[in-house]
Amino acid sequence: MEIIIGKTAGFCFGVANAVNKSKEQLKNKKNIFCLGELVHNKQVTEELENEGLIFIDDISEANEDIIIRAHGEKKETYSEAKKLGLNIIDLTCPKVTKIHKIAEEYEKKGYYIVLIGNKEHPETVATISYCGNNSYIIESKEDIDKALQNLYNSQISKLVILSQTTFSLAKFNEIVQLISKDIEDKNIDLEIKNTICDATRLRQEETKELSSKVDVMIIIGGRHSSNTNKLYEIAKTNCNNSILIESSDELDKNEIKKHKKIGIMAGASTPKKSIESVVEMLKKLC
């Protein structure tokens, strides 16, 4: 059995930064709260809980120190934290913070802002709060008509398109192309800001390449992780035997044994030890 591990598998910079800095904080103090999951990975969440991090769903449950997770938070969350007298430990991924600044800049310039992303994802929920009232989230091409109708009704002649950092590059390009075609005769100035981060893009590209060369493609990561699910979608288009797992316990050993070439890719919030555990199990089957 040949096992090929993707070079881009595992923690991205933003996740590694958030996890490492959280652990540093916990060495000195235990009464630290995190609003929502720091990153979308069950193993990481459990590890941080064991070290003393307290995860909450409502900021009113916190006292003293509050961590802002890697996905970022809505503008009003910061205001509320200050009103409550909380010490903010901001671990928002720098790539996400950059998008917030871009959104504020274009909102001040009077642009209508389209944010392409998963509507319920924490990053998208946070980013749209920086976009002002003249904005719309597009998750799929079915949302385009409504977004553009709002644009035309607003009588704004300037449009900028942004993206969630972990969105599918292929879907982003498809949506941008459809929007561009629709507004080409509408006298609207269009600016496209592909804010999908490089780590996401490279991971998606490598997954596409690797999944076309193997008999089985294993994607490791949280099932509610946006970037991990995108990798799984990409893998399935190239390899029928693509599977998404959170840990090595989920592998069907008897099924895996039947194949000669196994590819492995992991999401941006998947810890190294989860990847190593899968590899170790596969090696025992060789």
Place the predicted regions along the sequence by residue.
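The feature marks the mature, well-folded catalytic cores of soluble enzymes
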Residues: 1-286
